[in-house]
């Protein structure tokens, strides 16, 4: 039995030998299509000026990824300018973005991301509720308060996938 992976679909083919010939014939072909992603790969950018928080979030995301059979690559950035520069060359599937940062705040960073034509989902992380309404203007996927509740984070990640 052979299988072919096409995008995220697995197609399994099997055939039997023909009884009256000496070579394989497709007398019986069974095609099964399974919606199953064999390797789930995710690239996530984390933009936060607090290094300890970035490490904590990275650890939580790594734990979530292992639990859900994802291969995870994390790209940490300490400010919005560095993130914007990187997004020109590094494709990401999801961005975690702090709001209160030096140089360029998270809302303005998200505005720039959208002006670049990128539709990548953004999850804001901040210690303040005051920017929640502004996050809708830049089409945020979610808004989480610091310190991050692990169960809430995992729930948001589950909703994303």
PLM segments and residue spans:
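Acidic di-acidic motifs
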Residues: 48-50, 127
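Extreme N-terminal starter segment of soluble prokaryotic enzymes
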Residues: 41-44
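Two-component/phosphorelay signaling modules centered on CheY-like receiver
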Residues: 50-75, 115
